[in-house]
UniProtKB/Swiss-Prot annotation:
The organism's taxonomic lineage, starting at the top: Bacteria, Bacillati, Bacillota, Bacilli, Lactobacillales
An example molecular function term from Gene Ontology annotations: RNA binding
Organism whose genome encodes this protein: Streptococcus thermophilus (strain ATCC BAA-491 / LMD-9)
Record localization: Cytoplasm
InterPro entries to which the protein is assigned, alphabetical: KsgA/Erm, rRNA_Ade_diMease-like_C, rRNA_Ade_Mease_Trfase_CS, rRNA_Ade_methylase_Trfase_N, rRNA_adenine_dimethylase, SAM-dependent_MTases_sf
Catalytic EC class: transferase
Function, as annotated: Specifically dimethylates two adjacent adenosines (A1518 and A1519) in the loop of a conserved hairpin near the 3'-end of 16S rRNA in the 30S particle. May play a critical role in biogenesis of 30S subunits.
GO cellular component: cytosol
Name this polypeptide is given: Ribosomal RNA small subunit methyltransferase A
Amino acid sequence: MRIADYSVTKAVLERHGFTFKKSFGQNFLTDTNILQKIVNTAEINKNVNVIEIGPGIGALTEFLAENASEVMAFEIDERLVPILEDTLRDHDNVKVINEDVLKADLQTRVKEFENPDLPIKVVANLPYYITTPILMHLIESKIPFSEFVVMMQKEVADRISAEPNTKAYGSLSIAVQYYMTTKVAFAVPRTVFVPAPNVDSAILKMTRRKQPLVEVKDEDFFFRVSKASFLHRRKTLWNNLTSHFGKSEEVKNKLDQALENAAIKPSIRGEALSISDFARLSDALREAGL
């Protein structure tokens, strides 16, 4: 019997008198086939360390522990710590940390692995309400995570992996794809969770690039420009950029010059620009003194 078997999950929750907290976005997976698929997608083996976020009662953790060298699981809900100690008592390669991963000192934590030189993969069933902040926090951290295999709301997975000229493409697609290659591995129906969420989920696989997808002179400015370009999706690039940088004649002249230098039409919409277009645009805007 597995922790993720519905009857086991139910028994564990009842034994510990656990009640779900909406504020933590808790939905526990009760499908062993999907858990095995997650481990297969992440290609977990004994030469890999894993960081898991939001282990819940340990359904995914159990599969990870059987396959990985070590698992470090961050759980924000202190009520789940004794439950995890119970459900994972047979696995001595799991360390449960009762901490908000957004506040954790990950640089120090990863040194606590017994073999800290092994590649680190992030495998997680992320709370939907905080998926993007956690993801960006991990991607932008200096920890050399080689890969992320993450369960998230399907709509967010589609946005992250979207291509230009699609409805889902936006600043989030650019922010993640700048650092990572992305692929939606498979969809997960809402019916396999307790309690069932209001949305369908997907597993997104992200692999860190050896270097960012494009070269830019100022990363922060590049992300600022891409965000500004999607401020109002139906508006032109020109309208969004003037909303962001200002509408004075001086600013308009600089914008004109920058767009011309970047060979980008002001009448285009942000969603039509590729990531390399945004790199060219942000460098040109920076050179123009904006």
